[in-house]
């Protein structure tokens, strides 16, 4: 009897470890943000084993004959479950996936859409230049095994270097590059002029502090100016829950104040090692991830502006 119990206990342990566990359940629920546009809005956290990367916003646009996807999410399993949820709304293939930038929480789901539909991937050339199949990007190291399984790195098929205008199934899309480093080395935002919907990627976030670890404050300010020039009623950030016309306000205020305060600190001859105690950005301390990200943003932006002033 004791031997049987021991074997049962061992089996229970083995089959509940991540490698044997059932596929991670993302519990994805699409939110309709505009006519023919649905988004899966992520939690206001960094990627972790508990959220399995579902801290990113991904969107489906329903056209007359297919779905167009704006960012595919952090894993094959996330993408598969998102498509299953959207199939309850319309039984359509995904023929085009648009990737806004190179951070892998936004595009590792491409492997599902390439495998299932041979979807055309449109996005940054940076991905092709810096990632190859077999590389273990951040999501491979953070997500649990039952969430990241089957995920592969897929090359981008079309890499625009200027504004790309697309009409797909009667819906118009403008894919607009910033043209310089902003959130990352190569960022795009997507604008639907007839729908007045703008997808910002990580050029803007709300409800949480942005991570500008690979970015440029000057480029972010340029991107915000470019996005503001568009006539939008719906604004979808790369992370954040506010998809209204005010969805860019957080990012605009944060980066504008940061720039103004850095200029003042340089004028006052503040040293690099004391800048984070001088520029605190306390107006945003109630935003998610403030403690984790704000000081680094301030420090790196200060260094950037200080050198640009020389």
Task: Name each region found by the language model.
Residues 22, 229-231, 242-310:
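Accessory terminal helices/loops
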Residues 8-16:
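Bacterial N-terminal signal peptides
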Residues 84-158, 163-165:
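Active-site HxH/HxHxD metal-binding segment of metal-dependent hydrolases
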Residues 22-33, 66-68, 72-76, 129-258:
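Metallo-beta-lactamase
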Residues 17-21:
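Sec/Tat signal peptide C-region and signal peptidase I cleavage site
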Residues 35-85, 188-201:
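Conserved beta-strand hairpin/beta-sheet module of binuclear metal-dependent hydrolase folds
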Residues 1-9:
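Bacterial N-terminal signal peptides that target proteins for export
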């Amino acid at each position: 009897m004791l031997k049987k119990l021991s074997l049962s206990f061992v089996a229970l342990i083995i089959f509940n470890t991540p490698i044997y566990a059932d596929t991670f359940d993302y519990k994805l629920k699409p939110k309709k943000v505009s006519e023919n546009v649905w988004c899966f809005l992520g939690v206001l956290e960094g990627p972790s084993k508990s959220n399995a990367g579902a801290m990113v916003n991904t969107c489906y646009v329903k056209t007359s004959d297919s779905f167009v996807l704006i960012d595919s999410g952090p894993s094959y399993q996330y993408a598969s479950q998102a498509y299953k949820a959207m199939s309850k709304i319309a039984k359509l293939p995904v023929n085009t996936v648009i990737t806004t930038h190179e951070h892998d929480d936004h595009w590792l789901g491409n492997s599902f859409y390439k495998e299932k539909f041979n979807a055309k991937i449109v996005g940054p050339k940076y991905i092709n230049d810096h990632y190859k199949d077999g590389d273990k990007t951040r999501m491979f190291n953070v997500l649990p095994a039952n969430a990241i399984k089957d995920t592969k790195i897929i090359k981008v098929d079309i890499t625009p270097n200027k504004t790309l205008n697309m009409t797909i199934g009667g819906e118009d899309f403008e894919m607009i590059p910033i043209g310089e480093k902003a959130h990352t080395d190569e960022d795009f935002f997507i604008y639907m002029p007839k729908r007045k919907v703008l997808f910002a990627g990580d050029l803007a976030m709300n409800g949480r502090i942005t991570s500008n670890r690979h970015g440029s404050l000057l480029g972010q300010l340029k991107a915000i100016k470019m996005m503001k020039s568009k006539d939008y009623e719906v604004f979808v950030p790369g992370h954040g829950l506010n998809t209204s016309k005010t969805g860019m306000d957080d990012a605009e205020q944060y980066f504008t104040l940061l720039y103004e305060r850095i200029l003042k600190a340089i004028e006052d001859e503040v040293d690099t090692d004391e800048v984070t105690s001088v520029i605190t950005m306390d107006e945003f301390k109630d935003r998610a991830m403030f403690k984790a990200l704000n000081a680094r943003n301030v420090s790196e932006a200060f260094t950037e502006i200080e050198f640009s002033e020389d």
